Amino acid sequence: MVDVLAHESELLGLVKEYLDFAEFEDTLKTFLKECKIKGKPLSKSTCGSLRDPKSLKFQRDLLAAFDSGDQKVFFRLWEEHIPRPIRDGDSLAQKLEFYLHIHFAIYLLKHSAGRPDKEDLDERISYFKTFLETKGAALSQTTEFLPFYALPFVPNPMAHPSFKELFQDSWTSELKLKLEKFLALMFKASNTPKLLTLYKENGQSNKDVLQQLHQQLVEAERRSMTYLKRYNRIQADYHNLIGVTAELVDSLEATVSGKMITPEYLQSVCVRLFSNQMRQSLAHSVDFTRPGTASTMLRASLAPVKLKDVPLLPSLDYEKLKKDLILGSDRLKAFLLQALRWRLTTSHPGEQRETVLQAYISNDLLDCHSHSQRSVLQLLQSKSEVVRQYTARLINAFASLAEGRRYLAQSTKVLRMLEERLKEEDKDVITRENVLGALQKFSLRRPLQTAMIQDGLIFWLIDILKEPDCLSDYTLEYSVALLMNLCLRSAGKNMCAKVAGLVLKVLSDLLGHENHEIQPYVNGALYSILSIPSIREEARAMGMEDILRCFIKEGNAEMIRQIEFIIKQLNAEELLDGVLESDDDEDEDDEEDHDTMEADLDKDELIQPQLGELSGEKLLTTEYLGIMTNTGKARRRGTAGVQWGGPEPLRRPVTPGGHRTGYPA
């Protein structure tokens, strides 16, 4: 009761202000009469809270700082009195603030009688630069403001025709008028009764807290997925290291007979390569000096260690899933496509992931075998940018797995739709990256290589590779790798022969590109197409050997050896051994057995769930839980032997993810 009495006058003033605002005239008269009878004083300070002398003083001070060019005072007042939601979210406020920064940046140039103080001018220009690089960056794609991003770098902006208008008195007057109108509009809009403001702010505050907590939960789940994938990648790197070490040990064994190293040293190296638990027993029980023993033991150590059992993921109602993927809202489709992709990308390699993939395939999740006019695959042509992107991501995830590629390759319509999307997608970089990634992985299969060559994909690749600096690293790497895979085929080489000069120029330019990840694919493509006499002749005419020798001077040892092979191919009058082998049959010899689930599949997610929305595995198991129908383990082929050791250019199809981790194709 004491608290009520202490604030009674202010509370009654709030009620009066609201009744007046809502035009409860009779109620207000009765209320005022009763307050007077009871002797209750009304606070007068609540009414017109933003029309008080303080707000008027702020406006006067702000306009005075504008006139005097005092940018520090101006922007301090601006940030103190203009609410952040308006500064950051209102387009009118953002544009006005941009022009205000220009006003203060050029103030000394306009108002100095003589030469402006250089230190003060440099400080203002630096302040404007900082604004452009931070808050002002949001308007960098707007045509209206684009020329002003060059302003800090023009030596004499007063003489530059693009900025002539800025130095006219009318420009400053118009800007000041806009500022005055903005302040008048803002303070007029702020005459909302304080009671209503308090109510709205309290509700919004609670909502903001809940939204923030929900966002933190989503981020925590995302980090968890990232760490899981990082663990899987480290495990793959470890296996790769052991495989490489086995080759090293074979080389060391070959030198033992030459007494270059001692058997004791070889044994100590081998023991160190094994896990801690095995070192002591192996050191005494295995004779590593017997040829073949060490490398055999190392390869045997690659057998997967039995970890704790990983449970299979719950089965899903695929009929309901596919129905909602076709008929649901675009937002629901996007969340479902995301959740289905995450099932693949975050599942444990082995039985859990194989079971997920087999369930997708056996239920024809993508409708590869459907002849219906409406299918899941057609989401690749959706009007929604998010749905198109998330469909492309899911297809790329399928293509990252050998069984997934086999499933997608059964229908030529998948390839045709991807090719069409690749050539048409110009709005979304990530959609095109994922479509390109899927096609590149398709090129590991010979029938799909043939189809892509016949469809003229080589010409499209050459065209975009003419300007490699305009491409993302992913697009560049996968484009060059796809081009190389297609150039390994006779039909692909003959396609290149039709535009030999252009192909050779593009590849020679790429040799010097700063992205060194593409070098093996550029070398492989060059080596392959130079087996065609007409291309060799064109290469000699353009001085290709001199170009290649320039890169020998600055390349690493591995690249130097590859370029030497290319030069040898260039100067050959007859084809080198092995180049004439036939590649006309459509067998699957080029298909690789390993699975490469790259981290890029889940980068830069476009959608985040709002408060109360389900996403990911929670969405699938809450709304689409099915009966337990998990299929058995997929048939797995053994890991292929290493096909490429470095000295020669690549001569078998690869995919960038698999090539980097050391897996062969």
Swiss-Prot record:
Q: Note the coiled coil stretches, chain numbering.
A: 204-235
What residues does the LisH domain cover? 7-39
Record bears the keyword Transcription? no
Q: Which InterPro entries match?
A: ARM-like (IPR011989), ARM-type_fold (IPR016024), ARMC9 (IPR040369), ARMC9_ARM_dom (IPR048959), ARMC9_CTLH-like_dom (IPR056327), ARMC9_LisH (IPR048957), LisH (IPR006594)
Q: Which UniProt keywords apply?
A: Cell projection, Cilium biogenesis/degradation, Coiled coil, Cytoplasm, Cytoskeleton, Phosphoprotein
Q: Name one Pfam family in it.
A: ARMC9_LisH
As for subcellular location, the record says: Cytoplasm, Cytoskeleton, Cilium basal body; Cell projection, Cilium; Cytoplasm, Cytoskeleton, Microtubule organizing center, Centrosome, Centriole
- Gene3D superfamilies per the record? Leucine-rich Repeat Variant
List the GO terms this entry assigns under cellular component, sorted alphabetically.
centriole; ciliary basal body; ciliary tip; cilium; cytoplasm
Annotated positions of the Phosphoserine modification: 582
A biological process (GO) of this protein is: cilium assembly
Q: Which SUPFAM superfamilies match?
A: ARM repeat (SSF48371)
Record's compositionally biased regions (Acidic residues): 582-603
Region of interest: Disordered: 582-604, 636-665
Where is it predominantly found? Answer: cytoplasm
The record's function comment reads: Involved in ciliogenesis. It is required for appropriate acetylation and polyglutamylation of ciliary microtubules, and regulation of cilium length. Acts as a positive regulator of hedgehog (Hh)signaling. May participate in the trafficking and/or retention of GLI2 and GLI3 proteins at the ciliary tip.
Q: Quaternary arrangement and interactors, per the entry? A: Interacts with TOGARAM1, CCDC66, CEP104, CSPP1 and CEP290. Interacts with NDUFAF2.
Q: What is this protein called?
A: LisH domain-containing protein ARMC9
Q: What is the lineage of its organism?
A: Eukaryota, Metazoa, Chordata, Craniata, Vertebrata
Gene name of this polypeptide: ARMC9
